[in-house]
Amino acid sequence: MEPIEQQLTELRTTLRHHEYLYHVMDAPEIPDAEYDRLMRELRELEAQRPDLITPDSPTQRVGAAPLTAFNQIRHEVPMLSLDNVFDEESFLAFNKRVQDRLKSTENVIWCCELKLDGLAVSILYENGVLVSAATRGDGTTGEDITSNVRTIRAIPLKLHGDNIPARLEVRGEVFLPQAGFEKINEDARRTGGKVFANPRNAAAGSLRQLDPRITAKRPLTFFCYGVGILEGGELPDTHLGRLLQFKAWGLPVSDRVTLCDSPQAVLDFYRNVEKDRPTLGFDIDGVVIKVNSLALQEQLGFVARAPRWAVAFKFPAQEQMTFVRDVEFQVGRTGAITPVARLEPVQVAGVLVSNATLHNADEIERLGLRIGDKVVIRRAGDVIPQVVNVVLSERPEETRPIVFPTHCPVCGSDVERVEGEAVTRCTGGLICGAQRKESLKHFVSRRAMDVDGMGDKIIDQLVEREYVHTPADLFRLTAGKLTGLDRMGPKSAQNVVNALEKAKATTFARFLYALGIREVGEATAEGLAAYFGTLEALQAATIDELQKVPDVGIVVATHVFNFFAEESNRDVIVQLLAEGVHWPAPVVINVQEIDSPFAGKTVVLTGSLSQMSRDDAKARLVALGAKVAGSVSKKTDLVIAGEAAGSKLAKAQELGITVIDEAEMIRLLGA
């Protein structure tokens, strides 16, 4: 066997292995960027020796074989994938190839859209009624996922409108918004269930459940982007026209679709989407660029596995491989001990990453991680980098186990793990320097007491020099004492003292949030403040009374009750009030006297609003007698769903709670 034949055989074997892990097992071992590199290497070798191309080469087909647990559906029109480009030069070369093949000097009109990172599916409608749905599978045969697709509320079971074809197969992507993904993993960590590496794996795992009732509980959604079968009807003769027609029939289509009349316009679209990527609310890994004219698409045709008239312009990889050099343990404000992987520095999505969170001991066990392992690191948007999985096939010989501490790495106190919780905590409380620092940083933060100019480095020095032990000590600081800190001159010191004085005037809700009670976020603090009205009433509340507050269950109620039962916490509150911390007396709202559809209702906001900020919406709802909660429960009366609403919307639908959109909210606010 020639050396090049050996290379081809090894590359094909490696790619098939990773295709199986990705498409069939939903458990990829390497990042997409590494797979793309291997595929490019195979293509280049096959281009050198086309006589060695085999029919079963990964370059000659789309994906991997379907699972046998599902019935199979044969695609009447093959579901092809797209070729990729990774930089401007490659895209411009693709643009030139298209123009050369069309023998045209005029610019091609491109239709540009998002490259969603989910699971490709085909959905067949007959006379407007959904009759079947399938995964891509190997491009020729997919898995029958009809029962599961029917549970996705974004997908209409019946199309509406005129001139619907007798048989219409639409193609698109099923995906999981980031909020839904985080909620699924949060629940899994709490219950010991399967934790997904990323939203794409979670979407695939949710869609390919044998029990559709499980799929129905997952907040999956869908965007349509193409067509397969078309019989007994007509569609517009442009790609954008078809998308608009699909939308008119009730199929969801992304609103980020743009026509570009030049290569430069395409590059501008790419850059704008890349910039907006962290705020979309769902994962994408590039943009898709298609010739808009169907006539030109037909003229350009296909190669073995992809159309010549479209390409995926991928973003820099959000996943990379590197090595874990060590694991250190950090202590948070509630005593939670978090393992952090110290990595061989690696560029991920344009950022040099040298640390990644490992969450807790259960996560380390789930990953099977050892110090010295080669791992896949993921960084998406502003999310803290995390270890996705261990590359077991490349585990070095010299690795060592990760030993979770039995004593706090900062203060030496015992650690404990409460039964049913995933988190291990230091029991030292405020004698622990780490907990003290983090508690004080939380107390002065913008959403809490909002002490302008008091950053983390100042807090670190104040604790290390023993100037401050409790939040009340902050208000006793003088400009003279602050001037002794590093990089703190007289003017800066006086500014901090002035900011502390200004921060004394706050709100009851901000004060509660600043105290750092476990499980009490901003929304819960607002709910407690609105329900009890005064600190005295809240401190006297029983666990049963606390549970009457929207968004407060037994766990939160117990944490609040225990916080106020602790004498040292009550002492700190007394000291804070003695130092002049105050807030306005509560305004008593008699909801029975308010003529508003929101009066007396428990309302939850989810998704992003376009007409007003979330804070403005909350304020207007509260002014009209509503109680605004942070999560959906049986106590919820109404959910207001903005764009990219995730798990809260899904739970509301599951519980049969009334849901309205932003436009309806604005109409009712003015009613």
Curated annotation (Swiss-Prot):
Cofactor(s) of this protein: Mg(2+); Mn(2+)
Enzyme active site: 115 (n6-amp-lysine intermediate)
Gene Ontology process terms (BP): DNA repair; DNA replication
Residues reported to bind NAD(+): 32-36, 81-82, 113, 136, 173, 290, 314
Record field: catalytic activity: NAD(+) + (deoxyribonucleotide)n-3'-hydroxyl + 5'-phospho-(deoxyribonucleotide)m = (deoxyribonucleotide)n+m + AMP + beta-nicotinamide D-nucleotide
Keywords: DNA damage, DNA repair, DNA replication, Ligase, Magnesium, Manganese, Metal-binding, NAD, Zinc
Name the UniProt record assigns to this protein: DNA ligase
Native species: Salmonella choleraesuis (strain SC-B67)
